[in-house]
Amino acid sequence: KTIQLSEIIVGNSAAYIQKVYDRIKDNLIGNYTIDFFLRNVLKQEKETIVLQDLSGKKNQNISSKDKISIEILNMRKVKLYDKKEGIDFKFQNFEEISNLVAPSPSGCNFTEIEFNDENYKKIEFESKNKNTQGLGIKGYLVINKKDLAIVEFKMSSDIDTDLLPYSKFMLSKVKYRTPEWNKHIKFIKDVASNKYYPVSLKMDVKVEVVTDKKSFYFNNSIDLFTTSAPRDEKIIPNFSTDKDLFKAKFIYSADFWKSQNQLPLTKELDNFLKLVADKKDKTKEYEVTGNF
């Protein structure tokens, strides 16, 4: 039976959400390893300036001090740095990417919305109040009614930019702030363990930069997805999970990237690589960093 989207259902959704939170530990796999691919793209306004693709293994162990461990197997990356700009971008790390901050039952308003599958609930949330810097959140959760497991989660910024302050780079007049961000995670159930794990994650961040001459935006998009079922396997960690993603240093394998089909080069990215090739010898104006 298909339920059509219709009016808002008003109820005690905050109490229901607390029950969902109480089941998280039982619903999620505690210790497992998966294979993953990750794409990291940075644009300055609409122009791509960074491409980074990774493949590897991720171990998640909630009982360990290092809850996440990463073994990178393959990487290709390139960055086109315009020296006259004099501004670089700090990327997220694996801990920040994987971190899931649940909306507070007491700090948010929750509203159940009719969903197109009667086996699930969709509950939207938003901050009751923004803080003094204009920061708030909004988003939704999709929940399996049978076991109270979260199968989809999206959280976005809800910011009053009139109140949002700028930060400054040290010894510089350049200032910056983050007016927009969002994170979208999907979970599926592992057949063997009958528990859930995140199968895909997308994170987008928009950073506003203001100099004495102009203002512009950096737009960073990170996509991480799994390509295997969870398994019991020890990995050999070779990259710190609290380190800027782009600081990873691994040898490029042309054979691997030509044969894989998980992260194809779009026309836009292919044009970016051609642009890098055209400008890589203009060392006075540009600096190219990469492994291929």
Regions found by a protein language model. Name each.
Residues 2-121, 166, 174-292:
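Surface-exposed, low-complexity/disordered segments
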